[in-house]
């Protein structure tokens, strides 16, 4: 919007309303279409401006922690910075867990914490804490804005600070940005004469054309230097081509274009003749026909020592897969490792001989010659092992009539509608997806919070992913659900569809798989943390439909089709001890395989 339309969006009643409306208009021109606001008095000028802007949807959320994870889900879905507003005091502290997740996993958030002016700090004015650099080193950038003042230079300063904050949330790599916003009274949109020195600007019909002319939405992403044709002449490419015992590790990934990502990995694998060990949280398993060298059962295959499968070189795409067996194998084999990740972070917890290459796989694949390398004996060993393990695993799961949490992950890959966004909760669900999710071509879009791997904020993040998106499914355990049950309040504002598959095993099933499970009586209350919540009543309290699913056939009917609008909970009762025993038995079976595969 330009000209007179823009003029009508600036609120000249007082300095705070003008400050807020310039902030909102600048954000709108940068491309902002949705913001999350938490109630509070000190933040009223920001909330009012965002709520009044015709091109920004300001979504209210009472619980700041839930609101922040909701904004994180919106950022995952839109890949744009999401403004997140709160009042002064402890409110901003509740944003911290989601902000850490955004920093660790690389999602853009623009946190706006309203604050009291300097003269009301450190004097017990009430609802006041030290908010400057509240989030430590986690933000991409952080600053405290100046107090609103009645001069053109101050207005231009505000505009440019918002532009810079938006850009720093996106470049050079996405992440959170924090602006602390001090405001004096009046906080309500009442005329007080404070903008009188600016009346000449208000009356100037050309003001908006000149003031906002430099505010444009950033187009495209800044790519690392190197160009598209560098790879085939780079020294690392020559070293890769000289290795017959190499593997590509595809860890958790949420690329903007999953098919392009899958095609790039396949091109690299074919050119080198290397197998691709693909994590269940990678899109590769859902574009399986693109890559004949895809390996999905590596966790089972590596349960025992298998030197025939040990690589000499590894290309690691981003973070390592979750698999403990894989990590133990890499720690033993100590392969030469090449980390492909544009972020300047140490992503090698094994401390192997690793070289960091600051590129994305799409860039590397574009610079290598097309073609297919000769299939080595090492590649053939991996492919034979995968074929046998995949067939046996599929048979075991297909023949299983009762509920088993691992089968649910396998079953969803066969039954979810194509291209369904699937949010996968941390703890047991992500591991079952890695262990059991089969290769397929349904182009399902996995979403997850694997920056810090916690169970906090799962419901709220899933609501954000589902907002104005395709019908979305959340796969979660009972403790993750309860940990964020305050997020159920978001159901009343959801524009979209979210189906929650609630695995209720009455506690923390992941601990049944750990050595602590053998520790004796302290295990149940302190680790398994059993619960007896009536989820039907909990859902009823929030006006959310709840249904207990008893059979696989009933589940298939409930998911075909997914509803176009609304929230519902489908609860599945499982036995965490029996399921843990089954997983351990299957792992034991594979660990006893002979080393000559």
Swiss-Prot record:
Pathway: Quinol/quinone metabolism; 1,4-dihydroxy-2-naphthoate biosynthesis; 1,4-dihydroxy-2-naphthoate from chorismate: step 2/7; Cofactor biosynthesis; phylloquinone biosynthesis. Its EC number is 2.2.1.9. The keyword 4Fe-4S does not apply. GO terms for biological process: menaquinone biosynthetic process; phylloquinone biosynthetic process. Coiled coil: none annotated. Transmembrane segments: none annotated. It holds the Pfam family TPP_enzyme_C. Keywords: Magnesium, Manganese, Metal-binding, Thiamine pyrophosphate, Transferase. Signal peptide: none annotated. Binds 1 thiamine pyrophosphate per subunit. Catalyzes the thiamine diphosphate-dependent decarboxylation of 2-oxoglutarate and the subsequent addition of the resulting succinic semialdehyde-thiamine pyrophosphate anion to isochorismate to yield 2-succinyl-5-enolpyruvyl-6-hydroxy-3-cyclohexene-1-carboxylate (SEPHCHC). Belongs to the TPP enzyme family. MenD subfamily. Homodimer. This is 2-succinyl-5-enolpyruvyl-6-hydroxy-3-cyclohexene-1-carboxylate synthase. The lineage of its organism: Bacteria, Bacillati, Cyanobacteriota, Cyanophyceae, Synechococcales.
């Amino acid at each position: 919007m330009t000209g007179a339309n823009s003029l009508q969006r600036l609120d000249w009643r007082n300095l705070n309303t003008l400050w807020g409306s310039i902030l909102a208009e600048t954000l709108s021109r940068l491309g902002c279409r949705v913001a999350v606001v938490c109630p509070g008095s000190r933040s009223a000028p920001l909330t009012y401006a965002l709520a009044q802007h015709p091109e920004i949807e300001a979504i209210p959320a009472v619980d700041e922690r839930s609101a922040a994870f909701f904004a994180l889900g919106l950022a995952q879905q839109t890949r744009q910075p999401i403004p997140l507003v709160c009042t002064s005091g402890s409110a901003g502290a509740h944003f911290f867990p989601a902000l850490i997740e955004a920093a660790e996993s690389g999602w853009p958030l623009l946190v706006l914490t309203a604050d009291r002016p300097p003269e009301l700090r450190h004097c017990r004015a009430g609802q006041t804490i030290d908010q400057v650099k509240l989030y430590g080193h986690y933000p991409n950038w952080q600053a405290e804005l100046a107090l609103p003042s009645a001069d053109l230079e101050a207005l231009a300063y505000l505009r440019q600070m918002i532009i810079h904050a938006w850009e720093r949330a996106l470049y050079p790599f996405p992440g959170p940005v924090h602006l602390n916003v001090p405001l004096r009274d009046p906080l309500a949109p009442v005329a007080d004469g404070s903008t009188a020195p600016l009346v000449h600007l208000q009356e100037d019909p050309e003001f908006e054309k000149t003031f906002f002319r430099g505010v444009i939405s950033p187009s495209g992403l800044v790519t690392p230097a190197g160009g598209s044709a560098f790879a085939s002449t780079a020294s690392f490419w020559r070293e890769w081509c000289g290795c017959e015992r190499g593997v590509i590790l595809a860890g958790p990934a949420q690329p903007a274009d999953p098919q392009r990502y899958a095609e790039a990995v396949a091109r690299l694998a074919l050119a080198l003749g290397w197998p691709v060990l693909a994590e269940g949280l990678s899109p590769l398993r859902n574009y399986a026909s693109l890559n004949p060298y895809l390996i999905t059962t590596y966790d089972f295959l590596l349960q025992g020592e298998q030197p025939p499968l040990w690589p000499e070189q590894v290309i690691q795409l981003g973070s390592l897969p979750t698999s403990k067996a894989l990590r133990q194998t890499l720690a033993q084999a100590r392969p030469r490792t090449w980390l492909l990740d544009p972020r300047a972070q140490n992503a090698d917890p094994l401390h192997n001989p690793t070289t960091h290459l600051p590129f994305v796989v799409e860039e590397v694949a574009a610079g290598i010659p097309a073609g297919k390398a000769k299939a080595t004996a090492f590649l053939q060993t991996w492919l034979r092992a995968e074929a046998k393990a995949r067939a046996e695993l599929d048979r075991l799961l297909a023949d299983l009539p009762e509920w088993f949490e691992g089968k649910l992950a396998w079953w969803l890959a066969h039954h979810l509608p194509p291209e369904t966004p699937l949010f996968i909760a941390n703890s047991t669900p992500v591991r079952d997806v890695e262990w059991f999710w089969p290769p397929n071509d349904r182009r399902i879009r996995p979403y997850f919070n694997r920056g810090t791997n916690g169970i906090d904020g799962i419901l709220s993040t899933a609501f954000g992913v589902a907002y104005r998106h395709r019908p979305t499914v959340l796969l979660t355990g009972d403790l993750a659900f309860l940990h964020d049950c305050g997020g159920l309040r978001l159901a009343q504002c959801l524009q979209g569809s979210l189906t929650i598959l609630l695995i209720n095993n009455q506690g923390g099933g992941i601990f049944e798989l750990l050595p602590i499970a053998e520790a004796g009586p302290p295990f149940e209350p302190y680790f398994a943390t059993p619960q007896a919540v009536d989820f039907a009543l909990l859902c009823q309290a929030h006006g959310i439909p709840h249904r207990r699913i008893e059979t696989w056939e009933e589940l298939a009917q409930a998911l075909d089709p997914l509803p176009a609008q609304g929230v519902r909970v489908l609860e599945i009762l499982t036995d965490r001890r029996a399921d843990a025993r089954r997983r351990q038995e299957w792992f034991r079976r594979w660990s006893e395989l002979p080393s000559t595969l």
